[in-house]
């Protein structure tokens, strides 16, 4: 089928074109709202600025397709192959992208608000500046797992997104908006989250080993049983964070704000907390073996039964702190 025939039949009211072969065609700016192209072969096609809202493209072949600026709002794209496709500036609001292949796709500045990306493979995709606010990337019954390994998500808006259990190994999330995002049990080992806003995010049992969180906003986050070994948290704001049983051993947290944080039973062995603010924090039964707390502010902190025998407290402010033996430091 050629472009002329497709457009003529569509304009005549026909919408179902299941399994058609349209590889390499030029449909620049075409109005194809609600068209049914499931299973169609559109690889290498040009669909720049095309109107494809509510279109059915399930399991279609869109490898290398040019879709920059296209309108794909509420489109059915489950199982579609968009490997190496150009979706720069495309609008995919409320689109169904379950189990879609978006590997190496360009999604710069794309609108993915409220999109369903469960099980989608975004490995190596470039989502710089994309908006994923309210998007669903959650793991459901271990059947769906969003794959974002190595993806570029710099400055993206993921506020409120569900990324529970997502594979985010070595992902670039610099400056990203992750407020109120659910990252429970997500794999963020070696990820770059420098300057990201994670305020009020759910990070229970997240793996952030070796991650770069320098200058990140982590105010009021939930980090129960999280793994942060050898992570860089220099200058982070963890004020009021809920962090019982967290593993922060060998992490860099110098100059960080951990005031009012709950760090009960936390592993802070060999952690660098030089000049950090730990005022009014709970460190009950915390493990602080060979921890660097030089010049740190521990005023009014609760250190009941904490392990401090090899801790470096030179120049630390302990005024009003409850010491391991229960006495109040003057």
Region locations from a protein language model:
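Tandem repeat scaffolds
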Residues: 2-330
């Amino acid at each position: 089928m050629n472009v002329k025939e497709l457009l003529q039949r569509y304009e005549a009211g026909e919408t179902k074109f299941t399994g058609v072969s349209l590889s390499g065609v030029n449909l620049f700016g075409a109005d194809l709202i609600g068209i049914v192209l499931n299973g169609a072969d559109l690889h290498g096609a040009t669909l720049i600025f095309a109107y494809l809202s509510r279109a059915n493209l399930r399991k279609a072949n869109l490898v290398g397709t040019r879709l920059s600026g296209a309108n794909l709002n509420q489109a059915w794209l489950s199982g579609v192959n968009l490997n190496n496709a150009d979706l720069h500036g495309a609008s995919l609001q409320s689109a169904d992208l379950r189990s879609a292949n978006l590997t190496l796709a360009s999604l710069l500045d794309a609108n993915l608000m409220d999109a369903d990306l469960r099980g989608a493979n975004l490995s190596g995709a470039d989502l710089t500046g994309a908006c994923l606010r309210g998007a669903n990337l959650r793991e459901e019954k271990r059947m769906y797992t969003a794959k974002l390994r190595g993806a570029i998500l710099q400055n993206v808006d993921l506020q409120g997104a569900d990324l529970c259990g997502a594979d985010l190994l070595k992902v670039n999330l610099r400056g990203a908006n992750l407020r109120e995002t659910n990252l429970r049990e997500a794999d963020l080992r070696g990820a770059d989250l420098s300057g990201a806003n994670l305020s009020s995010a759910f990070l229970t049992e997240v793996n952030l080993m070796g991650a770069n969180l320098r200058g990140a906003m982590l105010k009021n986050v939930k980090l129960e049983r999280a793994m942060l070994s050898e992570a860089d948290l220099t200058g982070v704001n963890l004020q009021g964070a809920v962090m019982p049983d967290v593993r922060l051993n060998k992490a860099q947290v110098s100059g960080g704000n951990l005031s009012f944080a709950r760090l009960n039973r936390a592993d802070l062995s060999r952690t660098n907390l030089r000049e950090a603010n730990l005022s009014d924090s709970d460190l009950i039964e915390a493990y602080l073996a060979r921890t660097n707390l030089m010049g740190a502010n521990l005023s009014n902190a609760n250190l009941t039964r904490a392990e401090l025998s090899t801790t470096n407290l030179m120049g630390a402010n302990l005024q009003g702190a409850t010491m391991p033996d229960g006495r109040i430091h003057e």
